[in-house]
């Protein structure tokens, strides 16, 4: 194992955990309305938080776009998922205009935010030091912890709910990491992640 890659993978785990803790702490400081309860009186605070949350993911996105993984991705693999995202956004605007903010939340904050942090940065760094299985296990534990911890701290969830979020995060990490590696593009896991969560929100 390359010691430099091993060291970078440890740093990546630490950075992502710090990002998670700060993000959740900020959400606790700035109480937020859930998407279903947005009104003219509370939407500004929600937008402010979401903009800051999106901005916090920019450094992770930048590391991906500077990486060899992005440069070696074929053009169609880069463009097709983003084209489909544009189609989805258009359809939501026409069919469900009252859910447009929720769609962009799940696309930018959940899809882009989580995938750039966990696949575009963490998984990519782990893969330099470990094989796919080990990378998914380590990344999955962090991804599961992120969901369980935020659910507990922000929503005060039950033990069953926390364990469900933790397990779902691990399974999600496996699925999205496999999609990322198979497609060699961050666009596909972003699209699928955002669509799954948005559909879950609608249901």
Regions found by a protein language model. Give the residues of each.
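Hydrophobic alpha-helical transmembrane segments
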Residues: 1, 19-33, 51, 55, ...
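N-terminal, membrane-interfacial amphipathic/helix-forming hydrophobic leader that caps
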Residues: 1-69, 198-203
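Membrane-interface helix-boundary motifs at transmembrane edges
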Residues: 2-5, 66-77, 123-131, 180-184
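Residue-level signature of transmembrane alpha-helical entry/exit and packing/kink sites
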Residues: 8-16, 42, 46-50, 78, ...
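Juxtamembrane "helix-exit" motif on the non-cytosolic side of transmembrane helices
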Residues: 25-37, 91-99, 148-154
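Membrane interface segments of multi-pass transport proteins and intramembrane proteases
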Residues: 30-41, 73-74, 126-137
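Hydrophobic, membrane-inserted alpha-helices
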Residues: 83-91, 173-174
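Transmembrane helix-loop-helix hairpins at the membrane interface
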Residues: 96-203
């Amino acid at each position: 194992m390359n010691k430099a890659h091993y060291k970078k993978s440890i740093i990546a785990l630490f950075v992502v955990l710090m990002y998670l803790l700060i993000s959740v702490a900020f959400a606790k400081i700035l109480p937020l309305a859930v998407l279903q309860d947005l009104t003219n009186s509370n939407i500004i605070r929600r937008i402010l938080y979401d903009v800051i949350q999106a901005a916090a993911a920019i450094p992770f996105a930048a590391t991906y776009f500077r990486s060899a993984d992005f440069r070696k991705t074929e053009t169609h693999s880069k463009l097709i998922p983003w084209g489909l995202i544009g189609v989805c956004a258009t359809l939501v605007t026409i069919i469900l205009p009252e859910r447009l903010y929720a769609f962009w939340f799940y696309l930018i904050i959940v899809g882009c935010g989580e995938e750039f942090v966990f696949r575009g940065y963490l998984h990519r760094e782990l893969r330099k030091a470990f094989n796919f299985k080990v990378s998914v296990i380590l990344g999955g534990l962090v991804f599961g912890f992120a969901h369980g911890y935020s659910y507990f701290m922000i929503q005060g969830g039950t033990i069953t709910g926390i364990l469900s979020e933790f397990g779902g995060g691990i399974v999600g990490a496996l699925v999205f990491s496999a999609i990322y590696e198979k497609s060699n593009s961050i666009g596909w896991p972003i699209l699928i992640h955002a669509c799954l969560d948005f559909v879950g929100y609608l249901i």
